[in-house]
């Protein structure tokens, strides 16, 4: 004998089954990506890979930036006479900005806000 299942119950069961299927597909897809055999291994893992010595460290390593052919044949270009400064349009540079005036008083850090939230004893 079969019992009666209402329309709302059937809709709920279909939605629940669809959510379960979507969750399983996404879960196994994520697991396959993270635990799969084709996972890319990093070239170097800590602690096997140590930081390279600084330039001129005398570590016996080769030159990190090999010279290109003919690098010593041409003289270097004209050096910069002024340092590069990032300036935004409409904003004055820091050297031309006026020092702060007394019209804006210094306000120290705010005081801690303490409220008695402990239960009352009494």
Curated annotation (Swiss-Prot):
Residues of the signal peptide = 1-35
Keywords assigned:
Signal
Name the source's superkingdom.
Eukaryota
Q: Which residue ranges are recorded for the region named Disordered? A: 55-83
InterPro entries associated with the record? Os04g0629400-like
PANTHER family for this protein: PROLINE-RICH FAMILY PROTEIN (PTHR36036:SF1)
Protein name per its UniProtKB record: Uncharacterized protein Os04g0629400
Origin species, per record, is Oryza sativa subsp. japonica (Rice)
């Amino acid at each position: 004998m079969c019992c009666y299942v209402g329309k709302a119950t059937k809709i709920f069961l279909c939605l629940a089954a669809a959510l379960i299927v979507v969750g399983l597909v996404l879960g196994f897809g994520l697991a396959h990506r993270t635990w799969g055999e084709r996972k890319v291994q990093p070239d170097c893992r800590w602690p096997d890979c140590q930081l390279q010595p600084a330039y001129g460290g005398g570590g016996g390593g080769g030159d990190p930036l090999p010279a290109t052919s003919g690098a010593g044949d041409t003289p270097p270009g004209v050096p910069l006479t002024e340092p590069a400064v990032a300036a935004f349009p409409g904003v004055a540079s820091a050297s031309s900005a006026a020092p702060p005036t007394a019209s804006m008083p210094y306000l120290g850090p705010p005081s801690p806000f303490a409220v008695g939230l402990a239960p009352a004893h009494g």
